[in-house]
Amino acid sequence: MKEFAGKVAVVTGAASGIGLAMAQRFADEGMNVVLADIETEPLAIAESTVKAKGGAVLAVRADMLREEDIFRLADAAFETFGNVHILCNNAGVAGRAAFGVPVWEVPLSDWDWVMGVNFMGVLHGVRAFVPRMLAKGEEGHIVNTASMAGLGTASGPYHVSKHGVVVLSEGLFKDFRAMGAKLSASVVCPGWVNTNILDAERNRPPELERTDLAKVAERARLTMQAAGESLKRGIPPEEVARQVFEAVRDDQFYVLPAPPESVDAVLTRAQGIVARRNPV
């Protein structure tokens, strides 16, 4: 895409972090923006912040775990603005109690929650928006937020979900090319970013609550403490948003806002696979 002024962007997980930064960047480029998030009060604050940039803003409370919420979001976006040109499937959760825990001990409630938001939320976003975007016949772009965790070696629902988003996005890009569509796609794989993703437990639905959270959290404490410190030292969300905007503008698929050592680890893993070395 080369023209952004007056076009429409939809961003999920838009009340904070990377999502809010992307929404602000799109507004700076003259776009109308649809903000979606599960948290009502932060969403209202984000709406005011983005409105101050100029352009029209629509805020929709939506839970990316719920297929019906995602289709309702698409309905609201198309009914309000007539079309959507950029869709950012960005909302995600970390499932902090599952970090540092052997994969066979992670309860299904964690898998259902993390995979439901991080992977199925992206898939439902594609299903809800892409057919309508294709039918409009205009230039557009899908941006799916994965993680460097989606390019590395690890276990647990977060890493598995992000690997899924990478592969889904690669397939989406190839599908668009094969049909000669005016749509394209990018996958964003950030390293450590200064966000509040580790606090996502507050949004876990009651039916997927953990009864053993205190016990598991203690086992994962050191892992989470290290992760929290890394997040604090991470790059600002605005830098991720800058790279995302440039990727949409330049039709670049892989967006890697991460330090060189993280990118090098991806190459090392790929070389290990080709050499048939065991994971490390």
Task: Go through each PLM region and give its residues.
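A short, exposed helix-loop element centered on a Lys and neighboring polar residues
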Residues: 126-127, 170
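Canonical Rossmann dinucleotide-binding motif of NAD(H)/NADP(H)-dependent dehydrogenases/reductases
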Residues: 2-34
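SDR active-site lid
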Residues: 177-255
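Active-site helix of classical SDR
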Residues: 126, 161-164
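Substrate-binding pocket helix/loop in short-chain dehydrogenase/reductase
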Residues: 98-103, 107-112
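The beta1-alpha1 cofactor-binding region of Rossmann-like NAD(H)/NADP(H)-dependent oxidoreductases
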Residues: 40-41, 61-72, 108
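Residue(s) in the substrate-gating loop at a strand-loop-helix junction
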Residues: 147
